[in-house]
A protein has these predicted regions:
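Conserved NTP phosphate-binding and transfer environment spanning the P-loop NTPase/kinase superfamily
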Residues: 1-147
Length: 147
């Protein structure tokens, strides 16, 4: 399910218009845009085990996010966005957690992700999906194809 913040059931009006509203926020005079980070707390390895231990360890991710917002250059660029540089996220005391498992960018995974997002958009937004959102998905798809 592609439902960031689990908000889809609570949209009080057309979901496409809801997204379009959020896209206009940066157009306001003096707008201070939020920094947006994506975290997949539920990523699983090939054996079906969660890659990240969760719970209190999530504070480690939040610490990295805060340092990023504070201007620290602790990320590397990938076709899907910025991820922590190796060593930038505190993994001390987590012997079963692998940096490469957390931050590898797999072409098959992202090809599937793009297909699923496209289906989600079609099913939930149809023609009401703002063109900017589809343009971002198409740009992501192109970057994934070049991996």
């Amino acid at each position: 399910m592609h439902d960031p913040f689990a908000m889809r059931p609570f949209f009080g009006y057309n979901a496409g218009q809801y997204l379009a509203h959020w896209l206009t926020i940066g157009e306001r005079e003096g707008a201070r845009l939020p920094r947006i980070f994506h975290v997949n707390w539920f990523l699983k390895d090939a054996a079906g085990r969660y890659v990240w231990p969760g719970f209190g360890h999530n504070a480690r991710v939040l610490a990295w996010i805060c340092s990023r917002v504070g201007g620290e250059d602790n990320a590397r660029s990938t076709p899907v966005g910025l991820v922590p540089r190796e060593g930038a996220l505190d993994l001390d005391g987590l012997p079963s957690v692998s940096y490469s498992d957390l931050f590898s960018v797999s072409r098959p995974f992202w090809e599937k992700e793009v297909r699923e997002l496209r289906g989600y958009y079609e099913e939930n937004f149809g023609e009401d999906l703002p063109k900017e959102v589809m343009e971002e998905l198409e740009a992501l798809e192109e970057r994934v194809k070049k991996m």
